[in-house]
Amino acid sequence: MAKIDFRNKINWRRRFRSPPRVETERDILRIFESDRGRIVNSPAIRRLQQKTQVFPLERNAAVRTRLTHSLEVQQVGRYIAKEVLSRLKEQKLLEEYGLEELTGPFESVVEMACLMHDIGNPPFGHFGEAAINDWFRQRLAPGDALGQPLTDDRCEVQALRLHEGETALNALRRKVRQDLCSFEGNAQGIRLVHTLMRMNLTWAQVGCILKYTRPAWWFEATPASHSYLMKKPGYYLAEEEYVARLRKELDLAPYNRFPLTWIMEAADDISYCVADLEDAVEKRIFSAEQLYQHLYDAWGNHEKGSLFSQVVENAWEKSRANYLRQSAEDQFFMYLRVNTLNKLVPYAARRFIDNLPAIFTGDFNHALLEDDSDCSQLLELYKNVAMKQVFSHPDVEQLELQGYRVISGLLDIYQPLLKLSLEDFSELVAQERVRRLPIASRLYQKLSTRHRLAYVEAVNKLVRTAPEFALMEYYYRCRLIQDYISGMTDLYAWDEYRRLMAVE
């Protein structure tokens, strides 16, 4: 078992322009303060204010956006981190674990990972993800590339079809097709901070947002030892080299996770479960009283002194008593949130410490709040009621379907860029406008400069005479379109779709 020493994990160095040396705790803290500034001031964080949490295109400012949700996750993450450090201090383990001079960076890395955890999410959340993946699957048919070359391969792109006698190229084609059909918000977050935004964060800070460890091109069965850690794609083929370097810098074995990521994940789980229910009441999907009844019915066996009675019933009774002379609804959620935090945060901290050897190594194959405990049952209660009563509500489903159509429609609109030959697209990139390509020229002009530069840099690194050049150029071209559309806010995507479809 590896010795637990967080000085080997909280790596303050950066990919570029790393400080040559640090001598004091203050020097290290200053480096992580720089990370905080880069993150808080980034456009990706600002865009979260117009991205969906649960209710797309919501005009009621009291209902959460991705930004307000992320701020709440940040606070809960800070709370859990402080609880962990406090308990380790009580057990006189801070020095032994190399944390005595790293308590500030420990908290900061968790907080900023919490703030950033959703930056890669596309417009309309999971329905935006589904739209991107479905659109590319219909055109690239990754399932047809899993075996030997097929005469009836449904892939529409000639460069990506498998060919007899091209074993190495076929392996790459297989990876590319799978990768492009596995868009995921967490993987896009890694791409944003490194490739697109060039934030040059510390290795520890980036490691903390690598939530899932499965490569997006993975098409085999996941190993049982990492079934949870690899349940979703965590990074793309485009960032393979960067993530390999990240693992080396953080001393992580393949498919293992950075230790502090478990805290970020627990903070997200705690935050959104209560918040989604509160937003549903704010939207008048049901009343606070109806919500309490839903929770009561779904809990099942009610015993005196149960966690349900300590958290939910206690909040309900206090809100009825109206000690603070405020609206009973507001009081109910205040008490529900406080009671939930006061139970789940210490439990998450205890689970973190109890499983620290596996968590430090990075192969603890569970979430902190997913076990057979009452705390896990309470969290599952909130999730199940939200799924049954909120996400299945006709108003929510209608907006989600509209979001799916908007993203699919935008991909249709920008498809001419993907249908251009390598020669024509290269000419368009070089000249920015080509008279014989009027539609493609106008579409290309609309793409973000940041995304175009990322494409150009990636293609310039390729060897033009190499057999895989055409294949990888097309891969980065698809990434360009995915980067642009996934980076839109909900409102921008909605307005852009309406404008380009000539609805207004």
Swiss-Prot record:
Its cofactor is Mg(2+). One of its GO terms (biological process) is dGTP catabolic process. GO terms for molecular function: dGTPase activity; magnesium ion binding. It catalyses: dGTP + H2O = 2'-deoxyguanosine + triphosphate + H(+). The keyword Chaperone does not apply. It comes from the Bacteria. Pfam families: HD, HD_assoc. Keywords: Hydrolase, Magnesium. Its EC number is 3.1.5.1. Residues 66-273 form the HD domain. Homotetramer. Belongs to the dGTPase family. Type 1 subfamily. dGTPase preferentially hydrolyzes dGTP over the other canonical NTPs. This is Deoxyguanosinetriphosphate triphosphohydrolase. It comes from Klebsiella pneumoniae (strain 342). The gene is dgt.
